[in-house]
């Protein structure tokens, strides 16, 4: 949580457990690491290896001290995603791929002239590809070649707040202008008109024909087929 540190919930006992060692930590991202360990990204502190059994956390260095300081101590958070069973993505000013077996980092190859704008956020993994977004683009990372390319770019003053991919492979974008649908096959985008809300804070596709939307402190559902 944002200031409350790490908490766990056991769905069988329906009980929460709080880890006092993480109190006041602003947790930006969590992902699996090695057996019995998690990686946690803390805002303005860095990335740590966390042991849920003991509550202990130890600093984890991204590439080297210089890179780690640049990514973690300048008012931004590093987001984490396990994109394959053998690798973890550290999303910062670039995409840093960490090989769990070799314990090495590689930076994803970017398109020439393509600048990452704002914070990189994970959308998800689908077969050999991982999808990521910043405030202006949706990117596709080829997990085999470690190449990053932009699939979608928004124009002018449109800002991407949230992206989710549905069961058909289409992208739904929550922006400061509302809901946008992007079809990667035809490369067409459609702004969905509505008077119910303006800017979208967060959205997620349930993979069952609905897009769930958080906007204006309310929850909405867009029925994809029924429109």
Place the predicted regions along the sequence by residue.
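Carboxylate-rich, polar loop motifs that coordinate divalent cations or form catalytic acidic clusters
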Residues: 1-227
